[in-house]
């Protein structure tokens, strides 16, 4: 079922001749040293180790061995694109075993991933990049990553769970999805985590995401209320683990202001605004719905940091995707806007709940104190920053790029020169030079905000009209023009 979204070779050095005696000595050392060299764990040896230790039972281990063997057999029959995908999935499984990362709770996700890929690449149609599917009757969402095969898409899975919660008539599907997800969770960072088991953007499996885990917190907490089952609160509470532990196990990056929750556990220095914001939304949902003090503390530490970080992600004309990094593409600009709206709404509701009730003619006068036996709630954070930033990001979608040309006082014919301009936000920019109605130069490129320089070499003297047109990612167009005076070419010395 389609779920719908989302060369050089190394240098070969010269080989120098080795004296025979030295070569024989080296070979003998290698022969005698070989038995003592420790071999890396393999899938089969790791499964046997876990079975011998009683950590997995015989039938379970046999099932994993069968899945692995079937995948290896299928790989031998495949060629080209299909072979590349299944080989990559097998390589990830092998690397997980070799790294000593086979633990009982991780294996269900590892081997169901291998099983799904073996079946797909043996017979199913070639997918397109980013395609998402579910394998009925399962509710788990999978995504195709070229070069990594089919992988569990936890963000998509929990996004689907939240969508089922909103429908209100598909509680059975919601329960099935949450139960499936929990069956595939891994023990990590002192709790459970929903791991990604493939290589992505420099990260090696298994890694976790504050964005996906935060979305999972929302789904589990909402499910606990809707389905009237506190086991989902218990699961969400256990899923807080990665927010309390730094990489590589968790996503916590402690700061002077509080805590940043990373989008990728393998990228400690990369702060991504949309993932951080959504992690906070999930923590807030759990803390509020479960009335959980630890969840509330984690949210508060993160919100304090986002309050410091967020202004730097607003360029005044568009959003930045990450720090360090460039501007967001159109999709991520909208995603960040929407996540900020969600945080704005949550904090606005918090303030409304804390507002004093309207005065009643029958109520006794307030003494201004706190009732005995109760604890005064901490004031809700001011939502204005998040509400206002979301609104500015919405306005950005209909605001044309601003351009300013800084033309040189003069150019000279047949000599290299430059024209400088400033652009307010990422856009596709076309620079055109016109002489007497004829286009003599035109270049187009996608450029980010800031100052840019265009090289130009006029062939003739006279006025030259330079036009710059920018179309932003939302389709808004801005333009600027300037006339540049081109002087005659410099005269050559008679001695030349």
Across the structure, where does each feature detected by a protein language model lie?
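Glycine-centered tight-turn motifs at strand-turn-strand junctions
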Residues: 439-462
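Short proline/glycine-enriched turn/loop motifs at strand-loop junctions of beta-rich domains
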Residues: 423-428
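Well-ordered alpha-helical segments within folded domains of soluble proteins
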Residues: 87-97, 108, 151-168, 207-224, ...
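Structural helix-adjacent loops and short alpha-helical linkers that scaffold large soluble proteins
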Residues: 40, 55-65, 72-84, 94-106, ...
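Low-complexity, Ser/Thr/Pro/Gly-enriched N-terminal "stalk/linker" regions
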Residues: 39-155, 166-197
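Carbohydrate-binding/catalytic loop surfaces
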Residues: 129-148, 191-209, 253-274, 314-335, ...
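Long, well-ordered core segments of solenoidal/helical folds
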Residues: 117-150, 171-193, 233-255, 293-318, ...
